[in-house]
UniProtKB/Swiss-Prot annotation:
<dbReference type="InterPro" id="IPR013785">
    <property type="entry name" value="Aldolase_TIM"/>
</dbReference>
<feature type="binding site">
    <location>
        <position position="189"/>
    </location>
    <ligand>
        <name>substrate</name>
    </ligand>
</feature>
<dbReference type="GO" id="GO:0008701">
    <property type="term" value="F:4-hydroxy-2-oxovalerate aldolase activity"/>
</dbReference>
<dbReference type="InterPro" id="IPR050073">
    <property type="entry name" value="2-IPM_HCS-like"/>
</dbReference>
<dbReference type="InterPro" id="IPR035685">
    <property type="entry name" value="DRE_TIM_HOA"/>
</dbReference>
<keyword id="KW-0058">Aromatic hydrocarbons catabolism</keyword>
<feature type="region of interest" description="Disordered">
    <location>
        <begin position="1"/>
        <end position="23"/>
    </location>
</feature>
<feature type="domain" description="Pyruvate carboxyltransferase">
    <location>
        <begin position="27"/>
        <end position="279"/>
    </location>
</feature>
<dbReference type="InterPro" id="IPR000891">
    <property type="entry name" value="PYR_CT"/>
</dbReference>
<keyword id="KW-0456">Lyase</keyword>
<feature type="binding site">
    <location>
        <position position="220"/>
    </location>
    <ligand>
        <name>Mn(2+)</name>
    </ligand>
</feature>
<dbReference type="GO" id="GO:0009056">
    <property type="term" value="P:catabolic process"/>
</dbReference>
<dbReference type="Pfam" id="PF00682">
    <property type="entry name" value="HMGL-like"/>
</dbReference>
<feature type="compositionally biased region" description="Polar residues">
    <location>
        <begin position="1"/>
        <end position="13"/>
    </location>
</feature>
<dbReference type="GO" id="GO:0009098">
    <property type="term" value="P:L-leucine biosynthetic process"/>
</dbReference>
<dbReference type="InterPro" id="IPR012425">
    <property type="entry name" value="DmpG_comm"/>
</dbReference>
<dbReference type="Pfam" id="PF07836">
    <property type="entry name" value="DmpG_comm"/>
</dbReference>
Length: 377
């Protein structure tokens, strides 16, 4: 028998009798509490709160921390909601607080500009997601290219992914890849995807994307599937995972970070996060900030059921209060019309149409939804 000297390697035994080594995912966990979570507090985080959350997340081992107005860089506006601070103040708070996690931000072409991207980079942002509606990847080319020129990690973020069939979504992902994206996400902005829907979209991605291009999942919990959909995504090739403390995010929130990490531990996946630290920050810091519970309830469940952009929730609730409607009726009509992110201003139009449609019996309802509200005249 020939002996092997130290340092000499051999090819792995691939004989049929030897079971294959199980694949263990090594996840890139990105926290979105300080960006998507802005929606849950009407974009009102204080700078000190941002600093506290970022410090705790960094200590708990997440790979990246996303920070911006809920609608991305330059999102602060009457249409989307005025932020308590500028993006730059929040970003400076985060970049000054982290030593290991990658400071990240989000940019929606048409809201944020290349100038905004450059300013974010100057303040320490090193990764960016360029977000478009799921059928409009072509408008991301300039911003993805600019991010690459700055030496940033850049991902494409295809929002409302339930509105495009798997093959079409994959075609859009291929466009983002061609512009230079290192990663492309399935972004379930409406919390509408089921586990089968998630599986089919990631399989479609794998059919067309270069193996070197990463894929990621951004789930919302409107149907109660945030963790389950994220698990299915990882099982079908996703390496980047979005989640937030206590699920803090638009609608019923995002995939709850601490719950997902617990599941990932049970499944033996690598993630680098410290579970108890995440639990403590979720319960002691984040939950007390909520002026409206982030949970699956009749309004947020309607978001997922009707396939409505999750950040429409607070806008629809305000319109319902103003015009004496059931929030669910507004959301169901918004879903029927296929409204997408950026059309927040049209929610009032929907409410006025529903008021005009009200019958003489004092019942305000969307004929399509079958949901009624009592007469509040």
């Amino acid at each position: 028998m020939t002996s092997l000297s130290a340092g000499t390697s051999t090819a792995p035994d691939t004989s049929p009798d030897r079971p294959a080594e199980p694949f263990v995912p090594d996840l890139y966990v990105q926290d979105v509490t300080l960006r998507d979570g802005m929606h849950a507090v009407r974009h009102r985080y204080s700078v000190e709160t941002a600093r506290t959350i970022a410090t705790a997340l960094d200590a708990s081992g997440v790979r990246a921390i996303e920070v911006a107005h809920g609608d991305g860089l330059a999102g602060s506006s009457i249409n989307y909601g005025i932020g308590a601070h500028t993006d730059w103040e929040w970003i400076e708070a985060v970049t000054a607080s982290v030593t290991n996690a990658i400071p990240t931000s989000l940019l929606l072409p048409g809201i944020g500009t290349v100038r905004d991207l450059r300013q974010a980079h100057a303040l320490g942002i090193r990764s960016v997601r360029v977000a478009t509606h799921c059928t409009e990847a072509d408008i991301s080319a300039q911003h993805i290219s600019a991010a690459r020129d700055l030496g940033m990690d850049v991902a494409g973020f295809l929002m409302m992914s339930h509105m495009a069939a798997p093959a079409e979504l994959a075609r859009q992902a291929r466009l983002m890849e061609s512009y230079g994206a290192h990663c492309v996400y399935v972004t379930d902005s409406g919390g509408r995807l089921t586990m089968d829907d998630v599986r089919d979209r990631f399989r479609a991605y794998s059919d067309v994307l270069d193996p070197a291009t990463e894929t990621g999942i951004h789930a919302h919990h409107n149907l109660g599937l945030g963790v389950a959909n994220t698990v299915v995504a990882v099982e079908n090739g996703a390496t980047r995972v979005d989640a937030s403390l206590a699920g803090q995010g638009a609608g019923a929130g995002n995939c709850p970070l601490e719950a997902f990490i617990a599941v990932a531990d049970l499944m033996g996946w690598k993630h680098g996060c410290e579970l108890f630290g995440l639990m403590d920050t979720a319960d002691d810091v984040v939950r007390p900030l909520q002026d409206r519970p982030v949970r699956v309830d009749r309004e947020t469940l309607t978001l997922g059921y009707a396939g409505v952009y999750s950040s429409f929730l607070r806008h629809a609730e305000a319109a319902a209060t103003r015009y004496g409607l059931d929030t669910r009726t507004i959301l169901a009509e918004v879903g029927r019309r296929g409204m997408v992110g950026g059309q927040e201003d049209m929610i009032v139009d929907v409410a006025l149409d529903l008021v005009a449609r009200a019958t003489g019996r004092g019942i305000v309802a969307s004929a399509e939804s079958g949901i009624t509200a009592p007469d509040q005249s």
